[in-house]
């Protein structure tokens, strides 16, 4: 079994750019950014429970990274960058820390490296279980209306929130709930030590208005790019800024 994805071919000899979306997104999420890099072959992946991979269920990060590796093999991707936002960034970091063959580097936008104590993990597990129950039982428009009121999305205006609620409500609530629980921060290990000892290039993007993830970025041994005029979802709020940063990264 492999994950559903959309492949766009570029010039031979350059590494692939493998894009991983955030929670409730799909393979279209990164395309405005990715299509600015037409020289590179691009793979836009649907993570389990989302888009064309909605019927694929997993028990945890090991399953997700295993499926990702099988997907890369199926497309004969031997040399690549992982580019991930939020949940996709966490998947990218988890996969990269397993020393993937052919990995050139990782670009993470607003991805959490992991909670650092049992109290934080217990609180996150309670919160994610509550959200998962709502995704399973309530209309998605109502759930996402509340989801985008969370502090991390404080930079969004009303029009942006309404647009995201409408877009994300096309998902399957049950499969979102299952993926939320399977890949909760409560079950993700703290990756800080692994990332400090890494052998791959590691870049971190965060919006200038995303104070939580700017603080997290400062804890990581990463080359950090702050995206102007953007909050947590920087590639949606300022795609040109993310394109400029990614272009700079790929020139090295």
Swiss-Prot record:
<comment type="subunit">
    <text>Monomer.</text>
</comment>
<dbReference type="InterPro" id="IPR022485">
    <property type="entry name" value="SHCHC_synthase_MenH"/>
</dbReference>
<dbReference type="InterPro" id="IPR000073">
    <property type="entry name" value="AB_hydrolase_1"/>
</dbReference>
<keyword id="KW-0456">Lyase</keyword>
<dbReference type="InterPro" id="IPR029058">
    <property type="entry name" value="AB_hydrolase_fold"/>
</dbReference>
<comment type="function">
    <text>Catalyzes a proton abstraction reaction that results in 2,5-elimination of pyruvate from 2-succinyl-5-enolpyruvyl-6-hydroxy-3-cyclohexene-1-carboxylate (SEPHCHC) and the formation of 2-succinyl-6-hydroxy-2,4-cyclohexadiene-1-carboxylate (SHCHC).</text>
</comment>
<dbReference type="GO" id="GO:0070205">
    <property type="term" value="F:2-succinyl-6-hydroxy-2,4-cyclohexadiene-1-carboxylate synthase activity"/>
</dbReference>
<protein>
    <recommendedName>
        <fullName>2-succinyl-6-hydroxy-2,4-cyclohexadiene-1-carboxylate synthase</fullName>
        <ecNumber>4.2.99.20</ecNumber>
    </recommendedName>
</protein>
<dbReference type="GO" id="GO:0009234">
    <property type="term" value="P:menaquinone biosynthetic process"/>
</dbReference>
<dbReference type="Pfam" id="PF12697">
    <property type="entry name" value="Abhydrolase_6"/>
</dbReference>
<keyword id="KW-0474">Menaquinone biosynthesis</keyword>
<comment type="pathway">
    <text>Quinol/quinone metabolism; menaquinone biosynthesis.</text>
</comment>
<comment type="similarity">
    <text>Belongs to the AB hydrolase superfamily. MenH family.</text>
</comment>
<comment type="pathway">
    <text>Quinol/quinone metabolism; 1,4-dihydroxy-2-naphthoate biosynthesis; 1,4-dihydroxy-2-naphthoate from chorismate: step 3/7.</text>
</comment>
């Amino acid at each position: 079994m492999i994950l559903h994805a959309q492949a766009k071919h570029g010039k031979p000899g350059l590494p692939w750019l493998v894009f991983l979306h955030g929670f409730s997104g799909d393979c279209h999420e990164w395309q405005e950014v990715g299509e600015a890099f037409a020289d590179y072959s691009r793979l836009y992946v649907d993570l389990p429970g989302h888009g064309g991979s909605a019927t694929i269920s997993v028990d945890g990060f090991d399953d997700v990274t295993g499926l990702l590796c099988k997907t890369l093999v199926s497309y004969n991707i031997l040399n690549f960058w992982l580019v991930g936002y939020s949940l996709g960034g966490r998947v990218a970091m988890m996969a990269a820390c397993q020393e993937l063959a052919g990995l050139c580097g990782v670009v993470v936008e607003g991805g959490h490296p992991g909670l650092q104590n049992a109290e934080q993990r217990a609180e996150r597990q309670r919160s994610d279980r509550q959200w998962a129950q709502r995704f399973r039982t309530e209309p998605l428009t109502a759930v996402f209306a509340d989801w985008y009121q969370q502090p991390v999305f404080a930079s969004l205006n009303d029009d942006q929130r309404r647009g995201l609620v409408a877009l994300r409500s096309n998902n399957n609530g049950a499969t979102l709930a299952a993926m939320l629980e399977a890949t909760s921060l409560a079950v993700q290990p703290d990756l800080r030590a692994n990332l400090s000892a890494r052998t791959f290039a590691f870049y971190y993007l965060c919006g200038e208005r995303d104070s939580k993830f700017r603080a997290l970025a400062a804890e990581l041994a990463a080359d950090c790019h702050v995206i102007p005029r953007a909050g947590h979802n920087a590639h949606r709020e300022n795609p040109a800024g993310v394109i400029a940063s990614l272009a700079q990264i790929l020139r090295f």
